Amino acid sequence: MKYLCLLSLFFIGSLRAQPVNTLIQQAEQLERQLKEPEAIKLYQAVLLQEPAQVAALCKLAELHTVLANTAVDKKTKKLMYETAYAFAKRAYAADSNRVESSYVMAMASGNLTDFESDNRKIVEYVRDVRYYADRAVTLQPNYGKAQYVLGKWQYEMVKLSVFKKAAVKLFYGGLPEGNLDMAIACMEKCRQLEPYMVSNYLDLGRAYKENRNPTKAIEILTRLQKLPNRNSADAIMKATGAELLATLQ
């Protein structure tokens, strides 16, 4: 045990000795290899040197979301989503004018809506998704991920349960209704800007299905199956898309 502790301290010390740019490059390489836990360690090492390094904070929010999406049990999913949210908040506090900071705040807020039992908090998360998504699109209209999260918000508002809609009305007097045409428009724009974003294809296929356009849903979900896996959660999302596709054929 003592040996392992010393080895761990040596490892951390060696990481801290490396330049931030080198650590980020190594972390990005690990991401390309779908080694998210290892990449997370390097981004955390960046924060040991620069606690407000926005790029690292945003990456940590995204990578913990990937871990949540691959987790089997609900407890682990919630923990990873909460961790992602914490890093997103730090990123936004460090630089609220970075489009990536607003994007990860919208993403992380949306992830927590299904894991929150307090109605007031659910509504706050729903409102935050729209606020930060709008802010991200305003900062950079051609940031594909921002278009995706805004489109997903529109879709989710259409699909919002009666219970959650009642909570929204109770605490805030309601929110704008979701619009499937707007959801599809945003996600189609994301598809142009981020042609390999698996989650966008999956939700776009769902939106077309909900909008009673099975032909387009089949087209999108078929293309989804041909996309490369760019993170460990992509294979799971593609499998979900394949199941949905099977119901349409």
For the regions a language model picked out, list residue spans one by one:
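Short coil/linker segments at helix-helix boundaries
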Residues: L30-E38, L63-N97, V104-N142, K152-C190, ...
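N-terminal leader/linker segments that initiate helical-solenoid repeat arrays
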Residues: R16-N69
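Sec-dependent N-terminal signal peptides
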Residues: Y3-G13
